[in-house]
Amino acid sequence: MHSEYGSAYRNLFLNHWWWRAREEAIVGVLRERFQARPGARILDVGCGDGLFFDRLREFGEAEGVEPAEYLVDPLGPHRSRITIAPFDESFQPGGRYDLILMLDVLEHLDAPVVALRHAISLLEPHGLLLITVPAFNLIWTNHDRINQHRTRYTKASFRRIAEDAGIKILLARYLFFWLFPVKLAARAKESLLRPAPQVPQVPGRAINRFLFLLSRGEEKLSHLLPLPIGSSLLVMGSTPPPNS
């Protein structure tokens, strides 16, 4: 993540309609699919300053690992539960997790399969892995550049890396269908005007609220009519059963 983007991340996560709508979609899937229980262990990979920890309390005890030290407040309320380290084989927490989250993490990595294999190695036998990634390279924009993304995924391309990592996919769902043509238009505009990448801003209150409600309404409808495309992809997976 670009350092300028990182400095704005807290405000974006807490207030921007996109982050708020993504969080609600994630929580909704967890309520459907994850059996919350006292003492359940949750790992948030790429957790930043632990901004999602309070919401995860509904499902268990959250901790995190974050490679970018500048994103972690040394005096923050969750500092004791955050390990500043890369998410690779050197990260050995000494126990397994019931749920591992990788929220918009894999697109930053040169070796996503390696990271997925490590995540699977840290899961309990019946544990779950929940992942979000940006979708479709067709809508690659300056937003991807300032975020230092390596790629965007489709269901098919993600399924390939999941199979390589030994992950059984339980759910794959596109999010933000309405945003796809908007980003496609943004890409066309950028190809003509060549603007410099800029850190996103939180819109005005009315627009921010409208876009949040639009995204939430679309996500609820997607349970009845799956979205064929979207600007994000949400995946839930697990370790394959023995002898599969």
Predicted regions and their residues:
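Feature marks short, surface-exposed loop/turn motifs that line or immediately flank catalytic pockets
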Residues: 71, 137-139, 178
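A short His-aromatic
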Residues: 104, 108
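Conserved S-adenosyl-L-methionine
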Residues: 167-177
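A short glycine-rich, Lys/Arg-flanked "PGG" loop and its adjoining helix->strand segment in the class I
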Residues: 113-128
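Conserved N-terminal segment of class I S-adenosyl-L-methionine
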Residues: 1-103, 113-116, 200, 205, ...
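A C-terminal cap/extension of S-adenosyl-L-methionine-dependent methyltransferases
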Residues: 4, 179-244
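Short, glycine-/aromatic-enriched active-site segment of Class I SAM-dependent methyltransferases
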Residues: 10-12, 129-151, 155-163
